[in-house]
């Protein structure tokens, strides 16, 4: 066993000992030993126990640990500490700037147990509320996590958007193709992006490579009619050069996905595609133009053949924003600041405020006394700013048994309720499904929040039987949230059509914790389009009068 492996193991042991509040002297002794072993000019594994004990700065106790590690390839003490520590907490120890003391606060005070949750908390500005954390530390942690994500070669759509659009503009300005389009996963608005692909109507000539080299991209590779390179952030880019007469089919081909292309090709039956546009090619196949977001294979062709392709929702269709937080719980801006931003900047008609409920102690959840005070503030605001309206909501935790964490009397005081799971996420499918369905069957539940609890590229959601959950929402007239945070985008777009077919409304909710968070509704709209959502099936595309009636009807049923 190499010295570096032994040192790394001792370092982890010292970190876990400190995390679990063991004797500071022993912690320091193990940490010092890790440093010492790493600097030794000879392999310590070749030494006897007695020889290790004689090494300056180690001693009998440390020598015993090293001997045990070399002989058994493990440490009983380390295994015991690891069994008491969530794997995600151990993973956090690799993040620069996070020592055991800070990790302990993150774990015990904020209730965060993995890197995905930590990244989400950074986006919500939750870390700056904790002891020993400031804005600078939070940003450094966020950047480190983003760097680690990038090293895996996969990105959230929101992470690559500004780069992709800037690259498109630069190509138009400096390479000057006749036409250029972003294609691939980006054009299909996929939630995860592996590469940025473009189609350029231009010959790949000797003038292009020097320009790309001057842009400081890495690993530039010239192929036949294609140039590949990597951005500074690690994003793979592919430029595909075509002539104008082939551009329609090439645009379809490079947009994909492959299943969509294969089905379309079989429908074309060898038709002449020369000088045809995208729309003309779909017409040759006997179907209407299919929007790029829908091109994932099978579902879109069934809709096209039955002339049932939806008029996809647009961001401008949204009339209000539901599921948002303020300084009453873990938000950054006050209730008034959030509402005025919606009213004056976004020109929306209403805001749904849904601060965390009392079980969410880690997020400054509201007890009954604070709830009453918040509702008084909402009443005062609504009097001053009519016709704009704040709806009184709450993000009520779905407890482990599926119940909500307030009495019926308190629940009846809200205009609407978003019910979400935030704790005990380690469930099998049966348990998770039953837990959600019990909450859905609660007459006070209006919207089911982020149904699987997933954090893209960071944390898998708990497994659920989507059909059973959606069917329960249909039976109980519960709306399902499309959580618009780019890390969530949950309900997954693959289930939107099933929900729509069952008559379930979907709601594009930003889960905003500060004013800038409302911008996430745009990402929610993109993923809703991918799922085939039209404004008629979207709750917050309703105007103020329509949604007020819906909430009132729900409240009347609660009283039956």
List the predicted regions and their residue ranges.
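Accessory alpha-helical DNA-binding modules that contact the DNA backbone or grooves
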Residues: 14, 26-196, 200-227, 236, ...
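Two-metal-ion RNase H-like nuclease active-site motif
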Residues: 180-182, 320-324, 395
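Short acidic/polar active-site loop segments enriched in Thr and Asp
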Residues: 113, 178, 348-349, 446
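Charged catalytic cores and adjacent phosphate/nucleic-acid-binding surfaces used
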Residues: 189-326, 335-346, 358-388, 400-560
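Hydrophobic residues within beta-strands of alpha/beta enzymes
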Residues: 180, 351-353, 448, 480
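Charged, compositionally biased N-terminal leader segments and the immediate start
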Residues: 1-22
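Active-site catalytic microenvironments in core metabolic enzymes, especially phosphate/sugar-handling
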Residues: 393-396, 523
